[in-house]
Amino acid sequence: MLRRDFLKYSVALGVASALPLWSRAAFAAERPALPIPDLLTADASNRMQLIVKAGQSTFAGKNATTWGYNGNLLGPAVQLHKGKSVTVDIHNQLAEDTTLHWHGLEIPGIVDGGPQGIIPAGGTRTVTFTPQQRAATCWIHPHKHGKTGRQVAMGLAGLVLIEDDEIRKLRLPKQWGIDDVPVIIQDKRFSADGQIDYQLDIMTAAVGWFGDTLLTNGAIYPQHSAPKGWLRLRLLNGCNARSLNIAASDNRPLYVIASDGGLLAEPVKVTELPLLMGERFEVLVDISDGKAFDLVTLPVSQMGMAIAPFDKPHPVMRIQPLRITASGTLPDTLTTMPALPSLEGLTVRNLKLSMDPRLDMMGMQMLMKKYGAQAMSGMDHDSMNAHMQGGNMGHGEMDHGNMDHSGMNHGAMGNMNHGGKFDFHNANFINGQVFDMNKPMFAAQKGRHERWVISGVGDMMLHPFHIHGTQFRILSENGKAPAAHRTGWKDTVRVEGGISEVLVKFDHDAPKEHAYMAHCHLLEHEDTGMMLGFTV
């Protein structure tokens, strides 16, 4: 053995022995390099092209049909600039209709890309808009009603990077794909022949579609080699239904610098970072010690999501520091957050999220039959028992006093427990109603703050609630003050058996034909009715 090979081998053994057992097991296998999406920028005429297409990808040695934007799987990182208009031609080369939603962007309803913004098979849709919001990491994904879950599962997702003058002045890591790294995390389930195995059925309508394989930027357990110093990770939970809890395998801290809608006032130090479906957080991690480690997701208490291999810490990616050092820094302060306005006299909208108890019961039975007791591991047994006794349709906890009742179908709320043909495609509700594309639930006033009270009381399911056309502030989350890293600009809030309140404002028009959406971002809940439209 040559001396240099011996040294390299010794170093590798040293690195491997420093890692936990579940990580070391895979050390011998050659890991792929973390795929880095290309940056897509507008041309000289402020125009860009996105092509929605089918392709082929390889997972664990088997070829699978996948869908992507401008490629086989996922898509480019679309780069936008605050105050600069852009025109995007979206060409749909799939054999079915789709839409393209700009998740997190504050743009008019007509270009938002919700379920009304259909791009027919073989067709093209052109949108023009001017981002006026602060720098943020957002994303694109399809929003075809009833098909969103499947189209995302097939691979349609990509990042959107909004830049502004303020963030350019900060000395954050900003070398794309080197020390400024996108991390799109998704789980997949594959059939025996290697194809993506998506089903919308009673079980998935209840708990969501989840897989047993974790992909990071479309690759299984990849490695990223980065310069020593500060490493910036732009995290996106792109899963259909799985919440994540991100940590470093050696417990080194993560410094959260931005949430869905942009920079926090100052970095927030955490050792665990819960990440709901559709959420983005930007974190900085110090890798100046030169030691390799894994980014992992820790087990969560969400129903069905602690089934092996997710019953223990699961690697997302390996981070391998290089000998060279990068120049990015972690600033002490990042931006100035505006003070919250007075809540006196604001319009209050009460939204109640619920599930047809027949779907609830049958979905849970199917989950238990397929996976056994492990399906419920980590769950709170008291709330589970109350849930199993039919508690999830109670209405007593709703505050009717100052409620906007205009969109509520009381007949449906009273009757959905009884009789009627059961259709799991229409078995998830907001205020007792399934989504109706032709009937917006209410009209919000442009430029005025509103307080939205979103209740999941009586329902133990996790509902990451997403609102289009705005970046809001969380007033309370499941009855508690928001965690420090969740006090910034957000477009998604956790609703899980409790009540969450957000302060929203809409600065763009959304007419009936292109209403904004508000919905659960567990995609199978959204696809089976837990969504509403509203106008501005």
Curated annotation (Swiss-Prot):
Subunit: Monomer.
Gene3D superfamilies: Cupredoxins - blue copper proteins
Cofactor binding note: Binds 4 Cu cations per monomer.
Required cofactor(s): Cu cation
Cross-referenced Pfam families: Cu-oxidase_2, Cu-oxidase_3
InterPro entries assigned to the protein according to its UniProt record, in alphabetical order: Cu-oxidase-like_N, Cu-oxidase_C, Cu-oxidase_fam, Cu_oxidase_Cu_BS, Cupredoxin, TAT_signal
Main location: periplasm
Function, as annotated: Multicopper oxidase involved in copper homeostasis and copper tolerance under aerobic conditions. Is responsible for the oxidation of Cu(+) to the less harmful Cu(2+) in the periplasm, thereby preventing Cu(+) from entering the cytoplasm.
A Gene Ontology term for the protein's cellular component: periplasmic space
First-level EC class: oxidoreductase
Official protein name in the record: Multicopper oxidase CueO
PANTHER family recorded: BILIRUBIN OXIDASE (PTHR48267:SF1), CUPREDOXIN SUPERFAMILY PROTEIN (PTHR48267)
UniProt-listed CDD domains: CuRO_2_CueO_FtsP, CuRO_3_CueO_FtsP
Species annotation: Salmonella typhi
Positions contributing to Cu cation 1 binding: H101, H466
Binding site for Cu cation 4: H463, C520, H525
